[in-house]
Curated annotation (Swiss-Prot):
Binding site for S-adenosyl-L-methionine: 42-44, 61, 95, 109, 116
Keywords assigned by UniProt, alphabetized: Cytoplasm, Methyltransferase, rRNA processing, S-adenosyl-L-methionine, Transferase
Disulfide cross-links: none
Lineage top rank: taxon: Bacteria
Catalytic activity: cytidine(1402) in 16S rRNA + S-adenosyl-L-methionine = N(4)-methylcytidine(1402) in 16S rRNA + S-adenosyl-L-homocysteine + H(+)
Family listed: Belongs to the methyltransferase superfamily. RsmH family.
HAMAP family attached to this UniProt entry: 16SrRNA_methyltr_H (MF_01007)
Pfam families: Methyltransf_5
Molecular function, one GO term: rRNA (cytosine-N4-)-methyltransferase activity
This protein's record includes keyword Methyltransferase: yes
Identification of the protein by name: Ribosomal RNA small subunit methyltransferase H
Length: 327
């Protein structure tokens, strides 16, 4: 694990989504300790650290470029900002390294940053033309999008695009990819985007409100970075690190991720978990959290006008009210 605090890199403009709503959900307390599992360029982290005196924050990101930019942005907070280069599912390792046994609040903002989307060489976007990469951590040994596109089977590609991208044309797109790579490898985002666009039926292209490659690129990015697995592993652990009164806020941009967060929070808020045929509760299980909003919080008109990428963002948050009774 690499602890990083850079003060040499110039920051790139990036607007954090739902900034006011996220801070309200976390309700930071003076002297509290907070975890930002998806640090990005430090927008939410800066707001948390500025919100009350004496706050400390542990910020994680597997994108070294973003981590360096965040380090520069947060340098004015000195030793109150602790930054680590790691996956957010490995947050316990970072907290243990700091000697923390609890955090008063935790935040995830699960999306691709403007930094990643706007730099063609990162391979996340179908606008521009860059290498097929899509790895959040470009120095990792994990297979890139190039491997997925040029080496995986038709069935695996189809399943990936259909499941993670929720793409109705997954079969046509996977077939087009497999047929094309038999002639030449598909090396760039531009090549892949054009291939996907041609695979779409003309009638679908004519009425499409977004680029035909949107869902395919999303699916490949999620597969390359194991994004659902990351989220599942985080949710399985985080509640044990919150004290009574501690809060968790999660911002998602994709229906599969939002569904996973919603299901986890519903599970935590359950009371009795006895089988239905038992007439009286014998498990004694009590709700572990209270859900802070009846519906997910979404961006208002002003934010959408300033940042169109906030349109699909959904914020869900809980407050811990009891320890797990062990049932």
């Amino acid at each position: 694990m690499i602890q990083t605090m850079s003060d040499t890199t110039e920051p790139t403009r990036h607007v954090s989504v739902l900034p006011v709503e996220t801070l309200a959900a976390l309700d930071p307390r003076a002297g509290g300790r907070y975890l930002d599992g998806t640090l990005g360029m430090g927008g939410h982290a800066s707001a948390i650290l500025s919100s009350a005196p004496g706050i400390e924050l542990c910020g994680l990101d597997r994108d070294e470029e973003a981590l360096a930019l965040a380090g520069q942005r947060l340098s004015s907070f000195g030793g109150r900002a602790h930054l680590f280069h790691c996956r957010y599912s490995d947050f316990a390792e970072a907290l243990n390294e700091l000697g923390w046994d609890k955090v008063d609040g935790a935040l995830l903002d699960i999306g691709v940053s403007s930094l990643q989307l706007d730099e063609a060489e990162r391979g996340f976007s179908f606008y521009g033309d860059g290498p097929l990469d899509m790895r959040m951590d470009q120095n990792s040994a994990q297979p890139s999008a190039w491997h997925w596109v040029n080496r995986e089977s038709f069935d695996k590609l189809k399943d990936c695009i259909a499941t993670l991208g929720e793409e109705p044309q997954a079969g046509r797109i996977a077939r087009a990819i497999v047929d094309a790579r038999q002639k030449n490898t598909i090396d760039t985002t531009g090549q892949l985007a054009a291939l996907v666009e041609r695979a779409y039926p003309a009638a679908w292209r004519a009425k499409a409100r977004r680029h035909p490659a949107t869902r395919t690129f999303q699916a490949l990015r999620m597969a390359v970075n194991d994004e659902l697995g990351e989220l599942r592993r985080f949710l399985d652990q985080i509640l044990t690190w919150l004290p009574i009164g501690g809060r968790l806020a999660v911002i998602t941009f994709h229906s599969l991720e939002d569904r996973m967060v919603k299901q986890a929070m519903r599970h935590w808020v359950e009371g009795c978990r006895c089988p239905r045929h038992i007439p009286r509760c014998i498990c004694g299980h009590q709700p572990e959290v209270r859900i802070l909003h009846k519906k997910p919080v979404q961006a208002g008109p002003e934010e959408l006008a300033a940042n169109s990428r906030a349109g699909s963002a959904k914020l869900r948050a809980v407050e811990k009210i009891a320890e797990d009774s062990g049932s």
